[in-house]
Amino acid sequence: MAEYVNYVLGSLYVSDTATSTIPTDVRNFIAPPFPLNFWSGPTFTVSSNTRADPLKLVAARHRAAAAAIDTLEAQSQYGVANVDALIRPLERQVAKVADALAALEDAARAAESADAATPQVNASEADQRPDNIGQSLSEIQIAKNDVPMEFDTNLAVDLLATVFVSRAAGGSNGVVFGTWYRALQDRLVTERPVATRSIDYRDGRMSKTFMTTAVVSLQSCGRLYIGNRPYSAFEAAVLCLHLAHRAVNSNYTYPTSFSGLIEQLPVYIEAFSTALGDGTLGKVGYEFNGARLPKNQFHVPGGGGRYERGALNGHGVLETLIRLKVLPAIPGSLGTTSTAVGPELDADQTAYIDDVNKAAAAFLVRAQNLFLTEDQTLLRSTINTITALLLLRRLLWNGNVYTDRLRNNFQLGAIVPNLAVSQRDARGASGGDAAAMVSRSGNNNFTFLCERYVSPIYIANREVELTQLFPGLAALCLDAQTVARDQPQHRAVNVSTGRNQTNLTRLIGIELENRRRTAPVPINEVLAAHDAVALQYERGLGLLMQKPRLRASLEETRRLGQFNVASDYDLLYFVCLGYIPSLTSAM
């Protein structure tokens, strides 16, 4: 019976329901019990609380939104605190950088004028100055027809500051120094932009900071920075020239002080120049044996006292000093220490007697030995100093400083304030005065320089070297590589100055970078740059001394014109200062 269902018309088999017709009847509706209160539920009837439900929903949503806003605000405040903690140090660093950049901008803008300003001292203040301040100033005179000048520590640097101050008084920076310095500054800006952040080269102007660094770098060409030596190369050179003069002149009254020896340098140089030619059959050489010298290094390697044997051979100045017995033979050139020099080479057995040490004791009295052959770095620098003095004599020979002043690019009256020049001192102010002075000056200008310029500076600074006295001479020697490339029959004028001064540009860049960096450039890099410039200066000395017509060659190739040198008067000031300023009108 479980398989049958009772319907109104009778019983049917369940399996036959697909083909059977079942009449509609309540008894035939197979479904679960239907809810009795279904049609009276809330879906089909309106409740009295219908209006309150949306308000509750809105209130719930409002509370949820308020809670979300509170959470978001708390999170934002926490994030702001964290961001502030991270950004505050960065903001402080950025502020410091901005202040530093602003200070550098102001310094670069004002360095050309305000930083160079020196306080003007009137007559009443000058009378009230302490005695020690007045004594610290050195008085020198370069040209005979100019008044003496006083300076503090460095004439070239002090006068350079005065040049920019005098031009900045009119609210302009129109000062130029020739194409050589222009090319040098442009090359520095291109190759070492970091070093040029502290200089003002806007609108093509020449920077005072750059010019000061360049002049100081030129003055350092002949200085020795490794080792502690009681004597300078300039002092050793003066003593050697004095002894050489004594060797060729028996009847001569000599001074008793070292400053007196300096004033006699023109006489000594004249006699030494004659001795150079007398002892040489062929052409005098002014270069060492470069194959035996250390590469890219001026000092003796390893801190020793001697170069490789034969490294200093071939230089006419050294050979003349040995021939005149001013210097003893170079150690090792006459035999070893175990073998004595034979009588056939040294009859008097005086080959190793050093008169330079005796002269240093007599004139300088420092209780320190001076054996140049034992300190061959100092010997090399001494030979270069004597060669530079010979070159200076040739440059200034027969110079006429009494020509028309309007032909000179250097006008001292436009630079030095309150310059009262009397009629007696203003000779050469017109062409008529120059026509009255047609006689040759010979060595007079060099003699005047030694008496009124070199000697006072040496008295003020006993450690001064020749390149510090004559930075312009060093500039000409550094430029000599350009002159050497000109063939005798080559008529083109070489104006490619910048590419020949890579070493000097590097040294200037290092000096400028050291002024800005908290951690300076390593000392080895500084010494390498200095040695490169010193070696280039040494090669330039040899190249210029080989020129048979030195002045004519420099003028024909416009090597003097690139330094603003237009006359003998300009050349005299150029070798002493290292530059010739020209004041230009503002554009």
UniProtKB/Swiss-Prot annotation:
UniProt keywords (A-Z) are: Capsid protein, Host nucleus, Host-virus interaction, Viral genome packaging, Viral penetration into host nucleus, Viral release from host cell, Virion, Virus entry into host cell
Domain of life assignment: Viruses
Q: Where located? A: Virion; Host nucleus
Which processes are annotated in GO (biological process)?
symbiont entry into host cell; viral genome packaging; viral penetration into host nucleus
Chain segments annotated as coiled-coil in the UniProt record: none
What's in the GO CC field?
A: host cell; host cell nucleus; viral capsid
Q: Where is this region: Interaction with major capsid protein/MCP?
A: 1-53
Detail the disulphide connectivity of this chain as listed in its UniProt entry.
Answer: none
Report the Pfam families cross-referenced here: Herpes_UL25 (PF01499)
The UniProt record lists the keyword Amino-acid biosynthesis: no
- SUBUNIT field: Heterodimerizes with CVC1. Interacts with major capsid protein/MCP and triplex capsid protein 1/TRX1 at the pentamer vertices. Interacts with the large tegument protein/LTP.
Family per UniProt? Belongs to the herpesviridae CVC2 protein family.
This chain's protein is named Capsid vertex component 2
Q: Which organism is it from?
A: Equine herpesvirus 1 (strain Ab4p)
